[in-house]
């Protein structure tokens, strides 16, 4: 009777909804594993699960007075994770057919993300051979019973949902020592809990996600700042978004791809969200690609209009682009302010009260945004992402990293770069964190100073950029930083070492591709391993396809919610080419994406990048990684830049050409380093060419297309 009353009361106050199949809860040998976000979680499980479970309650809590008062109403057993007998008792209860609820985190989350998972919970699941049923509680973290004070906008009676996820199991790991088996079982359960979070994520568009972030963190919460040093709150960002969206209606049609050539600035974020709100598809134009690269992108995506800024073209010395590219209409943001009518203002203020009504009808699976590949190996391709794929990647990042509303991101990578867009804009905005948008990653003295001045806690970039920041920074500039993330190129040992020695900070290396929105794997404090790029993100499937001549690893293929909708190619403008990849049996499977990267997995699931499949040379029948050659050069000359290309060789098929900015780099020095590292002599180039400056892409990566042209020109000249 008491439970029935509280069930009615909770349903009335919190409008509780239970989703998922409750049938598996009545099976034999059931272990229920909810996330833990508030003091209400135990009551929610007791009141709304269709079974009467036994709760495993940690000893420190079970001895409290309120737990003794609840003893007549619920069954619980004290759990001391340091004592094996506690675990044995739970295994026995599961074996007897009693459903057991255990909170694997062992404590209420203080970040909103998953905390560490205690190994004992995973070991109970494996030892008892239980059916594991993950449960995801959403909304309770917004109550005053959570521990997220100051991180979310807490309220009296938020809506709470309980998601019962499909059952799974955890097999007993194969390891000689019990300690290792416990650890591995705990890691398996951690993976289950992360997959549960991904499975329970809401279906929403980018604009709806922004609205929900505003509601969750408060409209007066600062979320965005740029070099004007006038922070935007969620409310002021929403105002700008509505303004831009209203004006874009006059210059474009629904479902039209519109080019955006804008710097890292607050208004750029408003333009992106304003465009998707009104059903336009922003195409992020890479202004460093030059006239030829931009023309290819415009053709592939069938872009008719590019929105930019006069001030941006002035400061970036980019007027030649608008003068030479005449196939599109150029619209300048400065001109739009004068076009706002009284009717427009009324529309904007009305929708500021009800922003959801400003969004045109669309689905999460619809195309939301177009990015372009770097063009490092040919013409840029348009990569079409849906709302779902972009938001899935944000949620994957939030699932493994404990970013909170207390964090502040320094985002200097351009927004046309997938790394800069997803990690540098969408992730902080939708996590309640603040982000400082800076227009250039090349200002090596300014960026560290701004990290210090604006109290940033998260910084990310390529290995090249991070190395330069470290050299120019004061040892105290990064005293508040807790996450340093490297991606887009291989992390160099010298960069890693200077960050550790000078600032006491560990760089967390990740791996991503534009087609995956972009993050695929990343090292995080709870799961990091030197020499790897972390584990594959939750909700993704990965497989390796054998490559002839490559002994270790294979071509990485991926499938998951963050995979693109497809390519737009200049050869077939406007036609979407959906992803598909040949499986190991040679059959093309839709939905899979072939990265073209050669990787290997270690026994713990960490990813080791061997190189691009296209960046291997076949010399005298042996496969040689061009990245390995560049690593040799960096080991000899860490302060300079090096890049390898391939040329034809009549005797051996192919030969290596090393371009370097070090005039004193010789083959003898490289050969000596190769011998010390056990690298075969085939990997030591005979053709070494000095350049004062390597041609670079906007991301800071070497422009291999330009380097290959240099090689081809010389071969043509000698021919």
Curated annotation (Swiss-Prot):
GO terms for cellular component: plasma membrane. Residues 233-646 are annotated as: AMP-binding. The chain crosses the membrane at residues 258-277, 409-433. It catalyses: a 2-acyl-sn-glycero-3-phosphoethanolamine + a fatty acyl-[ACP] = a 1,2-diacyl-sn-glycero-3-phosphoethanolamine + holo-[ACP]; a long-chain fatty acid + holo-[ACP] + ATP = a long-chain fatty acyl-[ACP] + AMP + diphosphate. Residues 15-138 are annotated as: Acyltransferase. It comes from the Bacteria. SMART domains: PlsC. It is found in: Cell inner membrane. The active site is at residue 36. PROSITE patterns: AMP_BINDING. Its main location: membrane. Its EC number is 2.3.1.40, 6.2.1.20. Keywords: Acyltransferase, ATP-binding, Cell inner membrane, Cell membrane, Ligase, Membrane, Multifunctional enzyme, Nucleotide-binding, Transferase, Transmembrane, Transmembrane helix. GO terms for molecular function: acyl-[acyl-carrier-protein]-phospholipid O-acyltransferase activity; ATP binding; long-chain fatty acid [acyl-carrier-protein] ligase activity. GO terms for biological process: fatty acid metabolic process; phospholipid biosynthetic process. Pfam families: Acyltransferase (PF01553), AMP-binding (PF00501). Plays a role in lysophospholipid acylation. Transfers fatty acids to the 1-position via an enzyme-bound acyl-ACP intermediate in the presence of ATP and magnesium. Its physiological function is to regenerate phosphatidylethanolamine from 2-acyl-glycero-3-phosphoethanolamine (2-acyl-GPE) formed by transacylation reactions or degradation by phospholipase A1. In the N-terminal section; belongs to the 2-acyl-GPE acetyltransferase family. This is Bifunctional protein Aas. It comes from Cronobacter sakazakii (strain ATCC BAA-894) (Enterobacter sakazakii). The gene is aas.
């Amino acid at each position: 009777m008491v439970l029935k009353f509280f069930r009615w009361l909770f349903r009335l106050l919190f409008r509780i909804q239970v989703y998922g199949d409750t049938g598996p809860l009545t099976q034999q040998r059931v272990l229920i594993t909810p996330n833990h976000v508030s003091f209400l979680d135990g009551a929610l499980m007791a009141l709304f699960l269709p079974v009467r479970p036994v709760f495993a309650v940690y000893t420190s809590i079970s001895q409290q007075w309120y737990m003794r008062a609840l003893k007549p109403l619920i069954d619980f057993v004290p759990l001391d994770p340091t004592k094996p007998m506690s675990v044995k008792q739970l295994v026995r209860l599961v074996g007897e057919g009693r459903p057991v609820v255990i909170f694997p985190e062992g404590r209420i989350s203080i970040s909103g993300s998953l905390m560490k998972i205690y190994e004992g919970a995973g070991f109970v699941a494996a030892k008892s051979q239980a059916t594991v049923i993950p449960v995801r509680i959403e909304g309770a973290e917004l109550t005053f019973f959570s521990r997220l004070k100051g991180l979310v906008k807490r309220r009296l009676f938020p809506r709470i949902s309980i998601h019962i996820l499909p059952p799974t199991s955890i097999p007993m790991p194969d390891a000689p020592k019990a300690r290792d088996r416990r650890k591995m079982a705990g890691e398996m359960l951690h993976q289950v809990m992360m997959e549960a979070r991904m499975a329970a994520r809401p279906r929403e568009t980018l604009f709806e996600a922004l609205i929900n972030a505003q509601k969750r963190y408060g409209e007066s919460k600062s979320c965005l700042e740029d070099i004007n040093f006038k922070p935007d709150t969620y409310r002021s960002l929403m105002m700008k978004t509505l303004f831009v969206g209203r004006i874009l209606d006059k210059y474009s049609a629904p479902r039209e791809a519109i080019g955006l050539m804008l710097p890292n600035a607050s208004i750029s974020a408003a333009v992106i969200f304003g465009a998707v709100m009104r059903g336009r598809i922003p195409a992020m134009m890479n202004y460093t690609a030059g006239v030829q690269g931009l023309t290819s992108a415009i053709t592939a995506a069938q872009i008719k209009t590019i929105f930019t800024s006069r001030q941006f073209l002035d400061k970036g010395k980019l007027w030649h682009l608008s003068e030479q590219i005449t196939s599109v209409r150029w619209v300048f943001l400065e001109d739009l302010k004068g076009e706002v009518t009284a009717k427009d203002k009324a529309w904007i203020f009305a929708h500021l009260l009800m922003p959801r009504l400003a969004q045109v009808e669309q689905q999460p699976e619809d195309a939301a945004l177009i990015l372009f590949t770097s063009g490092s190996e040919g013409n840029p391709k348009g990569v079409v992402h849906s709302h779902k794929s972009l938001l899935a990647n944000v949620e994957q990042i939030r699932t493994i990293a404990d970013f909170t509303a207390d964090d502040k991101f320094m985002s200097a990578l351009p927004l046309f770069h997938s790394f800069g867009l997803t990690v540098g804009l969408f992730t902080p905005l939708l996590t309640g964190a603040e982000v400082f948008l800076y227009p250039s990653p090349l200002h090596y003295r300014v960026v560290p100073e701004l990290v210090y001045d604006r109290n940033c806690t998260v910084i990310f970039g390529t290995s090249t950029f991070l190395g330069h920041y470290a050299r120019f920074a004061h040892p105290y500039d990064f005293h508040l930083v807790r996450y340093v993330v490297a991606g887009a190129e291989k992390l160099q040992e010298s960069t890693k070492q200077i960050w550790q020695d000078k600032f006491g900070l560990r760089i967390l290396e990740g791996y991503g591709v534009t087609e995956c929105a972009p993050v695929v794997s990343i090292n995080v404090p709870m799961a990091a391993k030197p020499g790897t790029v972390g584990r594959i993100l939750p909700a993704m499937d990965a497989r390796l396809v054998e490559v002839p001549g490559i002994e270790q690893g294979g071509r990485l293929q991926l499938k998951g919610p963050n995979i693109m909708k497809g390519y737009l190619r200049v050869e077939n403008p406007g036609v979407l080419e959906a992803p598909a990849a040949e499986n190991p049996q040679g059959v093309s499977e839709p939905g899979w994406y072939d990265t073209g990267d050669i990787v290997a997995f270690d026994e713990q699931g960490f990813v080791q990048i061997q190189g691009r499949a296209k960046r291997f040379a076949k010399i005298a029948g042996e496969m040689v990684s061009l990245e390995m050659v560049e690593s040799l050069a960096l080991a000899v000359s860490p302060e300079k830049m090096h890049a390898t290309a391939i040329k034809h060789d009549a005797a051996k098929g192919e030969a290596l050409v090393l371009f370097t900015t070090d005039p004193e780099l010789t083959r003898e020095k490289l050969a000596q380093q190769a011998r010390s590292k056990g690298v075969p002599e085939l990997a030591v180039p005979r053709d070494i060419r000095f350049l004062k400056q390597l041609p670079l892409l906007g991301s800071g990566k070497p422009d291999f297309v330009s380097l290959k042209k240099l090689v081809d020109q010389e071969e043509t000249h000698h021919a």
